[in-house]
């Protein structure tokens, strides 16, 4: 049972035993083993409280985390709680017993992309489809300061519609990890997919490193083999550093040009995500508006996730709220949250009233979310309303630029709190 009904840690389900014999936490019926890794196993399960919907549950042994893997698990929770995108595996809940941590995730029923590409190369048309979906997910992550750092077919899954789902964010880096020189400094990734600048053991740009890995994935999809291969690891690194690869004869001229820019060894000259969106091969046969897909800012306002579960509350709260799992934790956004018993429509109307009083511009608006811009559009705040229960909603205000000294944002925050009832749940500002 939870230790204290008044503590934020009570949101995490902790039980006295390891597993309920009939159903995990009285909710999930564990099924077959889908796979296992260095410190976790993944099972298929049925959500008994949601009509038997199939989910995937990653089970992490806490005792394995004593070997320095705690940061790895913390990072995966921190990253995945930020991400809601159609081509990224959704993490819906985190539960714990005395000995295990359970990640409840969306089940990608189509399996690994790797298993399909190893049996046969893809056509350019199919390669283009998956590359577009990959770039859509990568663009979304980068807009939120998240760099995957281990993009490879084994971490690219397929759903029941054969659409792409990016998974395994255990090696991901966030903007909070960037050094004063503006670079990341941790060597991560799988050798055949790592960018050449990572091999220099100096600082590197996480977004540029991800783009290189996307290039390796695209090469593999089209060719059926990796661009850089050598039985000797140092020989492999030399080929990566010099970008020595041979494209198959069937590769079209436009694809050759794109791969050349993706696998550019100089990160300063490497193609960017925004440039990829304008590339002729990338755009072939599709309306440009369909390619870009969900814009980063637009997805902040999407209805997806409008009903909060326990995991949303844990992960959006202050650092102490995850101590029931494994200690201190850092909240990445400057965020203010409180609970109200007013309707969403009433709250949204009041937000607009306050915005008008403060001369703020409504940049974007949806039923449960609104994006406000200050003078000259130099900063913005997103206000979202998500349902907690039949009677209560959570009002969340995020300063996207994380500028805690923004005067108009502070004024907006104070006015909203006074206007939309006295808050009963408040996330403290990050020190």
Curated annotation (Swiss-Prot):
Its cofactor is Mn(2+). GO terms for molecular function: ATP binding; protein serine kinase activity; protein serine/threonine kinase activity. The modification Phosphothreonine is found at residue 186. InterPro entries: Kinase-like_dom_sf (IPR011009), NAF/FISL_domain (IPR018451), NAF_dom (IPR004041), Prot_kinase_dom (IPR000719), Protein_kinase_ATP_BS (IPR017441), Ser/Thr_kinase_AS (IPR008271). The modification Phosphoserine is found at residue 172. Gene3D superfamilies: Kinase associated domain 1, KA1, Phosphorylase Kinase, domain 1, Transferase(Phosphotransferase) domain 1. Residues 168-197 are annotated as: Activation loop. PANTHER family: CALCIUM/CALMODULIN-DEPENDENT PROTEIN KINASE KINASE-RELATED, CBL-INTERACTING SERINE_THREONINE-PROTEIN KINASE 22. This is CBL-interacting serine/threonine-protein kinase 22. The gene is CIPK22.
